[in-house]
Amino acid sequence: MAGQGSVRLTRKSDNVVIIEKDLATEEMVLSMGPQHPSTHGVLRLECRTDGEVVTEAEPYLGYLHRCFEKYCENVDYPAIVPYTDRMDYLAGMNSEMAYAIAVEKLLDIEIPRRVEFIRVIVSELNRIASHLVAIGTYAIDLGAFTPFLFCFRDREHILNMLEWASGARMLYNYIWIGGLAYDVPADFQKRVGEFVDYFRPKALELSRLLTENEIFVKRTKGIGIMPADVAINYGWSGPMLRGSGVQWDLRRNDPYSIYPELDFAVPVPDGKFSDVGDCLSRHLVRALEIEESLKIIEQCIEKMPSAEGFDPRAAVPKRIRPKAGEVYARAENPRGELGFYILSDGKSTSPVRCKARSSCFVNLSAMKDLSKGQLIPDLVAIIGSIDIVLGEVDR
């Protein structure tokens, strides 16, 4: 088959991408996934290609659909918490917190201060662990094996601490409506502080392993560029939106819990090292966010109230039957905004409707635009930069 020659991409003002090539070949339709290591789960992409150039990549979903929203209509409010763990199973604490905030808003109940601090600590630990998986698997997708080992080595320390606090390494069922399943162990703060001191130089070393790797930079810089206005129109959030240069983080722009009391930055690319909106920018945002999460954890350790006389279940309702009404609450998860819309009829102990707004689903919806005009090998870099979890996409 003849090569496609040089390829030129032109993005018009209405965001239509025009592909111009010196040579053309017969169009082929290739199926990538659902059993493919670089799709990070059971995702299938139907790719239309002209030689090595992708003209369209259509995602096909639903292979991991488990009826989450229907389950919610048939169980009590507290029984939904374990199901939220199984959406983004790499960031269960964050998902539990988003759901708990929604129901607590519906019930209009006040949460003890120590509970809020513990929630933020375990959520930020889970955020770091999730970003380590994203960075490690992204590296191995592009042929760099050592960073993968470094990421999973340090993630193990975090999982051990979360297991120490909650009893589980994943699928925690720890953040309850109104409180926590248990208080943290007596020297939890000391151990977390020691981890922060240990991990900060390791995070810098990990970042240098990739950003100073010429092959990694060439595989990601200028690939899968998404302009800020288009990202906003798609409804992107999290590192995907910030990678396009939009400084939007719910912890800062629509704060919840104790985040207004904490000092941290919202990193966005400046265009000096990467092309704003490309795969490399999205990777850099996740790497920089790890340091900000460490800052948040340090502040929480210093400010957390004493455990004297503390009952983690003091504000947990014995029976939950909210008054008739509806609520929407959202939180900044590692992959973006996770929101819950809950509708109560005032009679049942189960919600009439519980709708989950998944950041992974919304971010993945731009795959056609991201992939148009790219080379087939670059699809791997683009998918990895989105950092999807199919459990949350399909629900």
Swiss-Prot record:
Molecular functions per Gene Ontology: NAD binding; NADH:ubiquinone reductase (non-electrogenic) activity; quinone binding
Coarse class of the protein's main subcellular location: membrane
KW Transmembrane (keyword) present: no
Keyword vocabulary terms for this entry: Cell inner membrane, Cell membrane, Membrane, NAD, Quinone, Translocase, Transport
Gene3D superfamilies per UniProt: Cytochrome-c3 Hydrogenase, chain B
Listed Pfam families: Complex1_49kDa
Enzyme class: translocase
Superkingdom classification of source: Bacteria
Enzyme nomenclature, EC number: 7.1.1.-
Catalytic activity: a quinone + NADH + 5 H(+)(in) = a quinol + NAD(+) + 4 H(+)(out)
InterPro entries: NADH_Q_OxRdtase_suD, NDH1_su_D/H, NiFe-Hase_large
Classification via SUPFAM superfamilies: HydB/Nqo4-like (SSF56762)
Subcellular location, record wording: Cell inner membrane
Protein's job: NDH-1 shuttles electrons from NADH, via FMN and iron-sulfur (Fe-S) centers, to quinones in the respiratory chain. The immediate electron acceptor for the enzyme in this species is believed to be a menaquinone. Couples the redox reaction to proton translocation (for every two electrons transferred, four hydrogen ions are translocated across the cytoplasmic membrane), and thus conserves the redox energy in a proton gradient.
Assembly and binders: NDH-1 is composed of 14 different subunits. Subunits NuoB, C, D, E, F, and G constitute the peripheral sector of the complex.
Family, as annotated: Belongs to the complex I 49 kDa subunit family.
Protein name (Swiss-Prot/TrEMBL): NADH-quinone oxidoreductase subunit D
Organism this protein belongs to: Chlorobium luteolum (strain DSM 273 / BCRC 81028 / 2530) (Pelodictyon luteolum)
